[in-house]
A protein has these predicted regions:
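Cleavable N-terminal signal peptides
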Residues: 10, 20-21
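Short, linear, compositionally biased motifs with a strong N-terminal bias
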Residues: 10-14, 284
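Non-catalytic cap/lid and distal C-terminal segments of serine-dependent acyl enzymes
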Residues: 22-290
Length: 290
């Protein structure tokens, strides 16, 4: 009998333990008027949020291609990493749905793929209405991996009034698949996807330049948005990242660019995101948001 009671108590304690962790993550249902559908956005709150009235800065963390809003919480080997980062830096983290292959721009052809508007307007408005956030650009940063890295750089360049900084890990900085180190069939599938969303490319040498991070370097120079991006030596996106780095050097845009060992995979991004949050903390502190 004692053994049964002990086991029951153990499971009860375990349940309380896991509930404590689960309580730190909300999942918002965000209505997108522009796309006429509801999209999910997990929100990771620091423990201190429950006590007090202070306002918190927010990092919007975008997932990659063929991913979903679940990725940042389910694919890291340390399932509590985002909770730890939220607590360590006293930051709210939001990991929204971004579509499977949207690349986070507003498609002129597909009304169901308007993710620039969703991320930069509808999502931000919902988060600001729901939580005690710093409702100003000085309290918002956008970042992401792969397709999400493209989204972070693209959206921040076009909406400097919303974000004070942007971060990218292995970002798709150029939509020209000839620069990607990928199999031919994968490149072909992405070319078809871009044609579906944007129409046939007008320039086959540098297609869809206005929808690429590398095509927005003049905006990046004019904007007061702090930039950090990194890529692994063996990453399939190393060439576009080096391209963006060289363009920003040429036009004199301040930025931090890092190359280190790694590939286009979660172990690299799990390591990279911890370094990026150090950068984000520095930016928020300089803004008076932390």
């Amino acid at each position: 009998m004692k053994t049964i009671v002990k086991v029951c108590c153990t499971f009860c304690c375990m349940g309380l333990f896991f509930n404590c962790f689960a309580a730190k993550v909300d999942t918002l249902d965000v209505q997108s008027t522009v796309m006429q559908k509801t999209l999910k956005a997990p929100v990771i709150l620091p423990d201190s949020y429950q006590n007090g009235e202070r306002q918190y800065p927010v990092v919007y963390l975008l997932h990659g291609g063929q991913g979903s809003y679940r990725d940042w919480l389910s694919k890291l080997s340390d399932k509590q990493l985002l909770n730890k980062l939220a607590n360590q830096y006293q930051i709210i983290i939001v990991t929204p749905e971004g579509g499977s292959t949207s690349y986070y721009f507003d498609s002129p052809l597909d009304k169901a793929s308007q993710f620039e508007t969703f991320i930069s307007k509808e999502l931000v408005q919902k988060v600001d209405e729901t939580y005690r956030t710093i409702k100003d650009r000085k309290g918002r940063i956008i970042a992401g991996l792969s397709m999400g890295g493209h989204g972070a750089m693209y959206i921040s360049a076009r909406h400097p009034d919303i974000y004070c900084a942007a971060g990218s890990m292995s970002g798709v900085m150029d939509l020209n698949t000839k620069l990607w180190k990928v199999p031919a069939d994968f490149a072909k599938s992405r070319d078809k996807n871009f044609a579906r969303l944007l129409g046939a490319p007008k320039d086959t040498v540098s297609p869809y330049r206005e929808y690429c991070a590398v095509g927005l370097v003049d905006k990046m120079k004019a904007n007061d948005v702090k930039l950090i991006f990194d890529c692994g030596f063996d990453d399939i996106m190393i060439a576009p990242n080096r391209e963006l780095h060289q363009l920003l050097l040429a036009n004199g845009t301040p930025h931090e660019y890092i190359e280190r060992p790694g590939r286009h995979e979660w172990p690299y991004w799990e390591n990279a995101v911890t370094y990026q949050f150090l950068f984000f903390q520095k930016v928020f502190k300089a803004n008076g948001s932390l």
